[in-house]
Amino acid sequence: MGDWSALGRLLDKVQAYSTAGGKVWLSVLFIFRILVLGTAVESAWGDEQSAFKCNTQQPGCENVCYDKSFPISHVRFWVLQIIFVSTPTLLYLAHVFYLMRKEEKLNRKEEELKAVQNDGGDVELHLKKIELKKFKHGLEEHGKVKMKGSLLRTYIFSIIFKSICEVVFLVIQWYLYGFSLSAVYTCERTPCPHRVDCFLSRPTEKTIFIIFMLVVSLFSLLLNIIELFYVLFKRIKDRVKSRQNTQFPTGTLSPTPKELSTTKYAYYNGCSSPTAPLSPMSPPGYKLATGERTNSCRNYNKQANEQNWANYSTEQNRLGQNGSTISNSHAQAFDYPDDTHEHKKLTPGHELQPLALIDARPCSRASSRMSSRARPDDLDV
């Protein structure tokens, strides 16, 4: 058997760029195929032709009978099978090496452009193009190649080709000599004078190895199928996830903590706020001076809107921002549906008036003495 170290070193590099199923497949290939084929199987088939005997003295009869019984040696057949099955993996490895070389070139070019940028050159467009190329080839992480794009397609192609090779070689093996060996082979072929019987050495041992290699081939085929479905499922999942991210971006507008902490937009009439469940209510003893009031929560929306405009106008006047103050006449009239009343809109003659707070409580004596504001019933001194 030849030296398998060169093929082993190449396949060992694929471990860093394979999925979990691919790593298991490589382990099966190394341990149960190459190792067993290089040690036990070769010694079992070492005397294959020399121990093949026929009950005839006719020169050349044994050679033609051996050629008819075994068109190709089992050992050489399995060597060809390993080579063909490993070829797609080697092609995938070649693609990985190509991307790594591409990354080295892009990194050198990027360093040159950054040096030009440090000198004051405008190379932002070229740097962005290099970043796009790295992202396209899956090179956005330094020193690691991501399985995406063309590399992912190459990997899927390698899995499919490996599976096809496994099936084809199993069919060929079954067609040539089946999955077991007989102790006696009958041969009737020129230059044999008549039908002769030929005998094979250690047929049971060889049959065991044939079944073992058959099981390993079926197991490798199963691993390839599982890995193929895993890669395809992951690819579909990533596409659906990326599509959802594009349709529903995570960056939604939300109120700032400053806006949430302000209490200038109050809600009254005993109805809770639609956005903030714990909104400040009116102080006890105070009432809103509104036109017509109902107990329906639908009217609360209209009153809250009027109160908000009044508060906003008062704050603008207090800050002294003349010219930007919004008068009540600019407030838009909102229609609120009601099941029992008709929709009413504000007419130009009925403008919204600021909501005033009416003190329904009598002032205490202490507050009267402490207050420095003149009252109508105060005595003139």
Curated annotation (Swiss-Prot):
GO cellular component, one term: plasma membrane
Pfam families, sorted: Connexin, Connexin43
PANTHER family, sorted: CONNEXIN, GAP JUNCTION ALPHA-1 PROTEIN
Chief location bin: membrane
Resulting phenotype, residue 209 to I: In shf(j7e3); short fin ray segments
Extracellular-facing ranges: 45-76, 177-207
Family affiliation: Belongs to the connexin family. Alpha-type (group II) subfamily.
Sequence intervals crossing the membrane: 24-44, 77-97, 156-176, 208-228
Compartment list: Cell membrane; Cell junction, Gap junction
Record-linked InterPro entries: Alpha_helix_dom_sf, Connexin, Connexin43, Connexin43_C, Connexin_C, Connexin_CCC, Connexin_CS, Connexin_N
Protein's job: One gap junction consists of a cluster of closely packed pairs of transmembrane channels, the connexons, through which materials of low MW diffuse from one cell to a neighboring cell. Plays an essential role in gap junction communication in the ventricles. Plays a role in regulation of fin bone size and growth.
Name used for this protein in its record: Gap junction alpha-1 protein
Region (Disordered): 317-381
Tissue specificity of this protein: Expressed in adult ovary, heart, lens and liver. In growing caudal fins, expressed in cells flanking the germinal region of newly growing segments and in osteoblasts at segment boundaries.
Residue intervals annotated with topology Cytoplasmic: 2-23, 98-155, 229-381
Biased segments, Polar residues type: 317-331
PROSITE patterns found in the cross-reference section: CONNEXINS_1 (PS00407), CONNEXINS_2 (PS00408)
Disulfide bonds: 54-192, 187-198
Effect of residue 30 to V: In shf(j7e1); short fin ray segments
Gene deletion effect: Morpholino knockdown of the protein results in heart folding defects, reduced hematopoiesis and small eyes.
Keyword line: Cell junction, Cell membrane, Developmental protein, Differentiation, Disulfide bond, Gap junction, Membrane, Transmembrane, Transmembrane helix
Membrane topology (UniProt): Multi-pass membrane protein
Comp. bias (Low complexity): 360-373
